[in-house]
Structure formats: structure tokens, C-alpha cells
Amino acid sequence: NSNEFGNFIAIDDELKLPEDQPEPMTLEHTEPMHSDPLEMEEVEMEDIEGEMILDIDSCDANNSLAVVEYIEDLHAYYRKIEYLGCVSPTYMDEQLDLNERMRAILVDWLIEVHDKFDLMQETLFLTVNLIDRFLAKQNVVRKKLQLVGLVAMLLACKYEEVSVPVVSDLIHIADRAYTRKDILEMEKLMLNTLQYNMSLPTAYVFMRRFLKAAQADKKLELVAFFLVDLSLVEYEMLKFPPSLVAAAAVYTAQCTVSGFKHWNKTCEWHTNYSEDQLLECSMLMVGFHQKAGAGKLTGVHRKYGSAKFSFTAKCEPACFLLENKNQP
């Protein structure tokens, strides 16, 4: 069995979870979210067009881990440095033996691997970020692309996880296409190429904050992460900064769940994006949602179509966002 990489990509059946396994969904390290708007104190931070903006941090005043005193400064800093982790949206043009379809196959597969290893959500975002930043600086032959993905996930695990998959597990899941020496050599090359810089904000960092601003319940949270996971696979989404991708995912999720356009002043204030600024990215996400279960790259759809993720993939896409696509 071969594919566009020239190497076998497989996930061992023993590592797969049954799609209907009733395992509860948890997202690690998310900020406290509230399904009841009454739980969040209404504090008028700024009156824009007569609409109240909620102080989304008042409920965490007694939670030292929420660092309420610094949270706004932290996110202002994240917005300032997020572009350092972005790559050219045309970097694949410089690759001699790769194309964007191969990247999509790799990321789709890694999303399944990430799920089977039950890793934290931020690990996936960092994995894809490391892949893109590495490929933007280093030419890679297609038979080594899967190795790049495995090593990126290994590094992301070492940075984010408490328990890290052992190298032998990675070798096994790649059907022994690579040796331990291959993995360790690629790990060294990747770290040197990236100058050991692994602490740049990904879309996940912004998702936590923006979901809190949206007062997201579990359903909205799952739909937003479903949409942003779909976006990870798509090379064309590299033209958007992580904060915009996160904001668009929350906006599109709100539209998907409610059935109408929904972006209030609290969301606009805390994301610093207006609805108009999100529409281009949001419409792309709706398109990804429409085709999620079709074609060969269905890893995200299978993941979110399981009981573990509350069958989120079965929700109807917000197609009404596409209706005014060609209008000014």
C-alpha cells in the first residue's frame, strides 16, 4: 500500500477507538466558560451603539490561576507576536518534491493519530505550526514528509504534554517506515532549523479566550473546534493569522448553532475583530464543513462524528453565510 508520500501511512487498528464508544469529551486547559449568561457579571466596559460589553473575567476574580490582573496584557502580547509564528501562504512553491495536497494528507492523518493517543488540543495546533514553519525553511523529499509530521508531534508532546509517546510507538504507527535513528536525526534538524523556538501562540491560545467571550457552552465549543480542526488541514488558511482563524471559528460556530448571524459587541471587543473582518475566513470554514465527510480526507469528520465528540460533525453547516458571497 502506498500513497502520495511514497511511504505507508496507517493507524494500527488496535489504537483506534470505536466511533460509537461513549467516552466523555474533555478539552484540557480551557478557560472557564458559562452556558448561563447570568453567571457572568454585566459590567459596562464601553458602551458601543448602546450594547453592553460583558466583563468576562469578573467571574474569575478569586481564581489565581486565571491571572485576571494580567490576562488582557497577555493577549495583547500574543497578538503582537503571533505573526512571528506565521509562514508565507505560498511557501509550498519553494518545495521541489511536495505540494499542498501532500500537506493535507499528512495533517489529516496526524489529527487521527493525535486523537488515538488522546493528546491535548494545544498539542495538535503546535504540531501543525511546527510542520509549516519547518517546511517553510527546509526542503524535504516526499518520502520524509511523514517523518517530519511524526517528529513535529513528538516535539509538541514534549512541550505540552505530561506523558509523551515513546519513539517506538511512533515507529509502529508509521508501519516501521522509519527507524529510531531517523526520528532522532530529524528531531535535531527540526530544532536547529526552528532555533528551538516553540513558544509562539497558535490559534488554540486565542480559542480559549474567544470562546470565553462568547460564553460558550459545550456544544458551541465542540463546533468551534471542529471548524478550526478542518482549517488545520487546509493550506489556504495560512494566509490568516491565528487570532483571526480562532475568531472566525467561534463566529461560524455561533452561526451554525443558532442558525443566524451572531457576533455581539462583547465578542468584537475581546477578539478585536468585526463581523465583516471575519466573513472571508468564515465562508471558507463553511465550505470545509460542507465537504467534510466527502472525498478521501475525512479524518476530522470521523473524529467529530463519534460519541466521544458528541456527534458534532452531524450538525448542519451555516450555508446562509454563503448567500451574500458575491454581493459587496
From Swiss-Prot:
The keyword tRNA-binding does not apply. SMART domains: CYCLIN (SM00385), Cyclin_C (SM01332). Pfam families: Cyclin_C, Cyclin_N. Only expressed in organs with dividing cells. It comes from the Eukaryota. The keyword Cell cycle applies. One of its GO terms (molecular function) is cyclin-dependent protein serine/threonine kinase regulator activity. Keywords: Cell cycle, Cell division, Cyclin, Mitosis. PROSITE patterns: CYCLINS (PS00292). Transmembrane segments: none annotated. GO terms for biological process: cell division; mitotic cell cycle phase transition. PANTHER family: CYCLINS. Essential for the control of the cell cycle at the G2/M (mitosis) transition. Interacts with the CDC2 protein kinase to form a serine/threonine kinase holoenzyme complex also known as maturation promoting factor (MPF). The cyclin subunit imparts substrate specificity to the complex. Belongs to the cyclin family. Cyclin AB subfamily. This is G2/mitotic-specific cyclin-2. It comes from Medicago sativa.
